[in-house]
Amino acid sequence: MAQNLLECYKNKLAVSEGYYSKTHNGEKLSMNKKMVVARLLENTNKYMTEAFNNSVGTQRSDMGSYKRFALNLVTVAVPSLIAFDLVMVQPMSSMSGYVNYIEYVAGTNKGATAQGDVFNSPFALGDFDKDGNVKTTDADYTAARVVEVLTDDLTLSWTPVARIVKVDNVALTKEQAANITVDENGKITDGNDTQIIKAGAKVAYIYDNVVIPQNDLPILNAKMSMIPVVAKARRIAIYYSQIAAFQAKNDYGFDLGDQLAEQAVGRLAYEIDTEIVDTLVTNAAEDSELVWSKSLPHGVSKQEHYAGFVEVLEMAAAKLYQRTKKFAPNYLLIAADIKPILAFVPGFQAATVNNMNGPYMAGTLNGLKVYVSPNMEAKTFVLGVNGNDMMTSAAAYCPYMPVVPTQLLGYADGAMSQGFSTMYDIVVLNKALLIAGRVTA
């Protein structure tokens, strides 16, 4: 099926690759990206075919050119988006759905591990806390060692108890241990004069996990989780006068309808790219250590000082790797006022910018693709990971209906009108793959 789609739309994909290269510093479309464009072309083709088959309009002779126009829009508009470099792109087959994935969770309360704690998921080994850091689970979940906080009834959960090792991280002496007994139900009796065992104490102990029958076992459960995806619409219409179009063509040599259509599609593309960038920036937790001062120290040239900006980026990359244990960032989002700093940074290679429509690719820095967004807060930057799959993408752009036009309608008074619509959703997959910093004046 995949090869059939690529073969069917190979000519349009060649055009798509040309537009992609113009907006992505000469890069070529990967096989995965070609499949995305081909799938959107196929969805649009099916929609147009069904619409024409059900049509009872009087302008059926124009439908062939209209269909080509619609497919050409997809061919050009989709590859021009920066979405491919920043997030996973996954076309939707219906207007609403779910991104399903499996988490492997604890099925038993044992020590520091609570029932439902995540051991493994597509996103990381473990779960994330509010700051986006991976929470470590009990390394002794399957072992005989248990550390738990005592409740008021002074009863240990895992039995039979062989011996108590520590209380509140303090090892027991032989005399103290000899005066403490634990019955078969885990009830503790403390015969020490100082009453070491109290409610709320953290007790480390060893239980017999070999004898049978076992009262309880550490359990691993598979949990099906899902992220809802619901396509939302963006729509825009063009409206102009037949007389104005005639004058534009006759006096100035350009097609007003084509110009307005190009501007309408460009506006949709700008808003999609901006929404993607805003989503990433909003979900990137700012790290207080990732702050770099632009102010020049005494006796240091601007060239030397600005080159030091790389250090804070490397710190951010290290934090991101340490957080996830397996991912390093591959793109950098910056506010417009940070770009002049990069001109002094060794390793920055500026990209040739042919067409600029909102957020754009400014170049590369030590393997990071650098994107500038006019909507980002001044002096802020974000590093992120995108590998075009669920495990390695912070978010997903899910187009349901690519940019699809209506037919151009002409009215008796000479008014001309045409509409353009798109439907998609943007969902956050993994906030831990984003980290933000700041530049001070």
Describe each PLM feature range.
Residues Y9-K10, G57, I188, P213-N215, ...:
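Glycine- and aromatic-enriched membrane alpha-helices
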Residues M63-K67, M95-Y101, R235-A237, A328-L332, ...:
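Beta-sheet entry/capping signal
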Residues D85, A124, D208-V210, N221-V265, ...:
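Sequence/fold signature of self-assembling virion shell proteins
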